[in-house]
Amino acid sequence: MDDMQMRTWAEVDLSDLEHNYRALRGLLPRDCRFLGVVKANAYGHGAVPVAKRLEALGAEYLAVACLEEAGELRGAGIQTPILILGATPAADAPRLLELEVTQAVGDLETAQALSRAAQAAGKRLKVHLKADTGMSRLGFLCDETHLSRAAEEMARAAVLPGLEAEGIFTHFADADGDEAYTMRQFTRFLDLLGVLERR
């Protein structure tokens, strides 16, 4: 390393990552799958080495922010399923299909566009439906006023031809801060699941 150009660096001990993975895995029910978030270069810790270690440990899924990050992992030989948490334009659907990654979908229009693109390619694209329970970024809006509409649109998105809806998730806006707000988001998510289960 050239000290004149790189004045800071991080040394990541992957055995500590392994310890943390095993500790978290031990807290989960046996039928719960583990998704390791490695977006933003694994938060500065090195996406490829972290993803490779998580893959070797048996993590069932990895998550990244964007298509480029997914491409980096696939290019490094990572075979574990990858979820793209951010939005990807339908024009990039051929690359999603080529990489065999899963795309988060936060609105019906995007789902429909991805459906058309997947059908045109003669393939199926895996998607996870994202519920906006209070992050106010990406997702089907699931506050008390929009819950019914969100459930209806998610149900429609889940059965679009060319798509394989394999999951649903939300993003807690302040999970390590405002516990009351996090619980409100969690309640909204459970309410949404209840509405969807009754459909």
What role is predicted for each listed range?
Residues 1:
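Short, basic/glycine-rich phosphate-binding loops at helix/coil junctions
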Residues 4, 8-11, 18, 32-199:
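Active-site-proximal beta-alpha core segment in soluble small-molecule metabolic enzymes
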Residues 24:
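Active-site anion-handling motifs in enzyme catalytic cores
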Residues 21:
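Short-chain dehydrogenase/reductase
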Residues 27:
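Conserved PLP-enzyme active-site core in the AAT-like
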